[in-house]
């Protein structure tokens, strides 16, 4: 296979322009629909200015870009190849002995670079902005009340209301063992409705079980009273193990570079990090998925003889194929989340299968 630098740059430029155009149009539509949806959700909050709605839509946009990036690549590749085919540029190029693989090579290299930049540079930016978007949602009360529970490397923090009392619970270390949640260095602070401190409980160990914190090696602190010690102390709570697991930070808000440490933390604490591991592997496989989408686009747009007809059928076929592969990837992803499939298999199967199907179709069209 021969490579012409001039031809490669020319094809790459055509693809980049078509890709940016497709990405820009899709981003504009997503931004418009997000603004409309946020306006609907804030209709009962007259105090929220329109500038805040625009800010939220902008913070969410990078995360949506990552979701639609494969479609933008496929549409951009189809548009670039169709433009060059209609202008007879590809016809002339193919007539002098340039194969489809030589035409695709520069596009695949560009897409690989786009995928690497997306994972290593754009994803951290997207995670930071999406985290700010979720905080704005909580501040503006657009998704119910903010979560009273936080679990992370700083331990567990919980805020609950018991009648007219406010309760804050903190544990420096938390670990899941089977169906039990075990805590170390537990502090409980109880205040009244006016946030006046009533009493506190310090415990060396704790366990969450059936709506109660069972604390051991306890010291009870009351204002104006000496410190009391007790072998155990039971404290009622609304917290469950399922709520703790559901409260883990969504992987979309964690940078690609920080995901491994988060995964190690959760696994060392005995929790399942399946969701984070699957998201991390999906990021690693995303450049391959983008390249596979180029192959799918080429199957429906590299045919040089436009007089053979069926142009609209091939365009529709390309779009439908893209959505079918997307649906397939979501089904496999769901199987990975449920631990039906291994994480690596669930993350890498869709791009590998898509790429192999594209390669097989191109081999058939190119070499018969």
What kind of region is each of these model predictions?
Residues 50, 111-224:
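Non-transmembrane, extracytosolic/lumenal segments of membrane-associated proteins
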Residues 241-270:
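Extended, hydrophilic extramembrane loops/domains of integral membrane proteins
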Residues 271-364:
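Transmembrane alpha-helical segments that form the functional core of multipass membrane systems
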Residues 25, 61-80:
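Long, hydrophobic alpha-helical segments
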Residues 94-99, 339:
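Short helix-to-coil transition segments within interhelical loops
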Residues 10, 14-18, 102-115:
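Start (N-cap) of specific transmembrane helices in multi-pass transporter permeases
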Residues 77-91, 96:
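Transmembrane helix boundary and interhelical loop/hinge segments in multi-pass membrane proteins
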Residues 1-60, 189:
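Hydrophobic alpha-helical transmembrane segments
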């Amino acid at each position: 296979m021969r490579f012409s630098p001039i031809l490669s740059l020319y094809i790459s430029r055509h693809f980049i322009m078509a890709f940016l155009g497709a990405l820009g149009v899709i981003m504009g539509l997503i931004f418009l629909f997000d603004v409309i949806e946020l306006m609907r959700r804030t209709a009962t909050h007259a105090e929220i200015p329109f500038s805040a709605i625009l800010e939220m839509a902008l913070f969410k946009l990078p995360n949506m870009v990552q979701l639609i990036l494969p479609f933008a690549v496929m549409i951009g590749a189809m548009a670039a190849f169709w433009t060059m085919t209609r202008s007879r540029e590809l016809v002339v190029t193919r007539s002098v002995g340039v194969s489809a693989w030589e035409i695709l090579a520069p596009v695949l290299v560009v897409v690989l670079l786009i995928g690497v930049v997306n994972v290593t540079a754009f994803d951290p930016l997207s995670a930071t902005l999406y985290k700010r978007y979720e905080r704005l949602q909580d501040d503006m009360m657009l998704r119910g009340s903010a979560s009273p529970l936080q679990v992370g490397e700083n331990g567990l923090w919980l805020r609950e209301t018991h009648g007219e009392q406010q309760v804050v619970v903190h544990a420096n270390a938390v670990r899941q063992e089977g169906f039990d949640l075990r805590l170390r260095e537990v502090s409980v602070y109880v205040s009244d409705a006016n946030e006046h401190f009533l009493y506190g409980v310090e415990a060396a160990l704790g366990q969450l079980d059936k709506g109660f914190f069972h604390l051991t090696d306890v010291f009870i602190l009351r204002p104006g009273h000496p410190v009391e010690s007790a072998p155990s102390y039971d404290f009622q709570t609304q917290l469950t193990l399922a709520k703790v697991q559901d409260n883990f930070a969504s992987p979309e808000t964690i940078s690609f570079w920080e995901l491994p440490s988060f995964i190690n933390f959760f696994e060392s604490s005995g929790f399942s990090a399946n969701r984070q591991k699957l998201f991390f592997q999906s990021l690693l496989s995303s450049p391959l998925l983008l390249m596979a989408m180029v192959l799918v686009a080429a199957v429906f747009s590299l045919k040089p003889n436009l007089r053979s007809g069926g142009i609209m059928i091939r365009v529709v076929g390309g779009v439908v194929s893209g959505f079918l592969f997307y649906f397939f990837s979501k089904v496999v992803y769901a199987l990975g989340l449920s631990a039906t499939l291994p994480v690596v298999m669930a993350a890498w199967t869709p791009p590998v299968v898509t790429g192999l199907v594209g390669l097989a179709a191109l081999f058939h069209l190119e070499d018969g």
